[in-house]
């Protein structure tokens, strides 16, 4: 059985969350653990992946966007999306060498974990041909955008629990114009974020065949093997 660590946080500014990811990345790179799953919410932020640009898929003036939320260009795949309170963001920092060096399989498994989670709440979700993420009909409930370096993953998924969906109205989320977004709340499911996080950990353990130990931020200090 693979062994990993899970870190559950509250509402975190985007750049602070990125720094936490980088610390986790270094720990996984040193093979101190097979993977680290970071769970949090972000303060309102729009992020643009490597396929997007500032002039694409933003439906209002940039200055107005920046009044509503932070805006960053980031390393993950995909185009623009929104993160904010009421959304479970999961950053799996996994060494794919411990599984299979197959990015498509990794994304498939991320989707599978969310699909299984939503099924427990009576939400029938699935995949959509030609698109990533998890969908309920023609509306996306969970976005996926990852980056991989040295077969270690970072960035991740964003599941809309009770997110303010009006933020998505200012953009073409993920560059998609013909379909919309939804949330668990919009689908009639009222649930606490912490409960969703706990159940998502369970689904990650099932799908990725890994056992997590819960840690806090102090455990992300990377051991210098030269001094150990």
Swiss-Prot record:
Pfam families xrefs: LplA-B_cat
Subcellular location: Cytoplasm
Intrachain S-S bonds: none
Catalytic activity: octanoyl-[ACP] + L-lysyl-[protein] = N(6)-octanoyl-L-lysyl-[protein] + holo-[ACP] + H(+)
TM helices/strands, residue ranges: none
Any one GO cellular component localisation term in the record: cytoplasm
Catalytic residues in the record: 174
Residue ranges of domain BPL/LPL catalytic in the record: 31-212
Keywords, in A-Z order: Acyltransferase, Cytoplasm, Transferase
HAMAP family linked: LipB (MF_00013)
PANTHER family from the UniProt entry: LIPOYLTRANSFERASE 2, MITOCHONDRIAL-RELATED, OCTANOYLTRANSFERASE
Membership in a protein family: Belongs to the LipB family.
Miscellaneous remark of the record: In the reaction, the free carboxyl group of octanoic acid is attached via an amide linkage to the epsilon-amino group of a specific lysine residue of lipoyl domains of lipoate-dependent enzymes.
Record's protein name: Octanoyltransferase
Organism: Caldanaerobacter subterraneus subsp. tengcongensis (strain DSM 15242 / JCM 11007 / NBRC 100824 / MB4)
Name of the gene: lipB
